[in-house]
Amino acid sequence: MLNEFINFETISRSDWQRFYQEDQVSLTPEELESIRSLNDKIDVQEVRDIYLPLINLIRIYHRAAEDLTFSKGIFLQKAQANRPFIIGISGSVAVGKSTTSRLLQLLLQRTFPKAKVDMVTTDGFLFPNQVLIDKGILNRKGFPESYDMPLLLNFLDTVKNGGDVNIPVYSHEIYDIVPGLTQKISQPNFLIVEGINVFQNPINQRLYMSDYFDFSIYIDADVKNIKTWYLERFQTLLELARKDENNYYHRFTKFTKEEALSLAQKTWKEINLVNLENYIEPTRNRAELILHKGDSHKIDLIHLKK
């Protein structure tokens, strides 16, 4: 059987944290709390040990991309326009992609004070619920066919080539695309694209999302841990929705604790686990970097593509 990680350099946490540089600016606990997702656990030590060395690595890739653009200009004998450095971040539901994305956005802004650093989630490219209903695939929400891939690829192409674009906004509170609300992306220096599908091959397409990425990260963890984190997040969402009748999750607050847990476990088994095993995890080795989380959400192993 082929070793999936044969093309990766495997690095322990203790070795990885040595790549931290003392002159880097860290974050305060308050800043971390402001970007942390619901049940994700991250502290200043994790930033120092894992994410500041990661910023150093991204700086290397960014510098190499700039050098390549400059060299192409010399070869073609014409100036090349600066293009945004795009970072793709993937992984399962509830694994902590959003926290990692927001943390990198903040650290990149600190590292490159004059740079514009934007972040988008591919949730905004899900078809609206009514379209999914019309297609008969509402129960497949989050699976590859539930995304408007031509729109997503057109967005990446436009941004990569210096254009401005307005994209849809998804709300987890209403569990749908927000009508009339858009996010404008206008010539960023860095763009972070986060979503479960960022490494997947679109059906009948000649372009792939990964064609536009300058760096890519997969957030990995054992399935049993991801399931635990998903169930914990579901309970947190119910608590937040208890007093908000407009929240999608409010309807489930009428359930008993046992009924709610049963629903969450059913959703995990029939949707999220199937999606992870069939569509998300198989794309893992397309990433440039794999960050593996242990039981406590701490990164315990790093795989860097050779």
Curated annotation (Swiss-Prot):
- Molecular function via GO: ATP binding; pantothenate kinase activity
Q: What is its EC number?
A: 2.7.1.33
Which keywords, in A-to-Z order, does the entry hold?
ATP-binding, Coenzyme A biosynthesis, Cytoplasm, Kinase, Nucleotide-binding, Transferase
Q: Which SUPFAM superfamilies match?
A: P-loop containing nucleoside triphosphate hydrolases
Q: Which InterPro entries match?
A: P-loop_NTPase (IPR027417), PanK (IPR004566), PRK/URK (IPR006083)
What's its catalytic activity?
(R)-pantothenate + ATP = (R)-4'-phosphopantothenate + ADP + H(+)
Gene Ontology biological process terms, A to Z: coenzyme A biosynthetic process
Q: Which GO terms describe its cellular component?
A: cytoplasm
Annotated membrane-spanning segments are none
* Compartments, record wording: Cytoplasm
Please tell me where ATP binds in this chain: 91-98
Query: Which CDD domains does the entry link to?
Result: PanK
From the UniProt record, give the pathway where this protein acts: Cofactor biosynthesis; coenzyme A biosynthesis; CoA from (R)-pantothenate: step 1/5
**Any keyword Ribosomal protein?**
no
Keyword Cytoplasm attached: yes
* Chief place of localization: cytoplasm
Q: Describe the family membership recorded for this protein in Swiss-Prot or TrEMBL.
A: Belongs to the prokaryotic pantothenate kinase family.
The record's listing under HAMAP family reads: Pantothen_kinase_1
Q: What is this protein called?
A: Pantothenate kinase
**Annotated organism of origin:** Streptococcus thermophilus (strain ATCC BAA-250 / LMG 18311)
Gene this protein is translated from = coaA
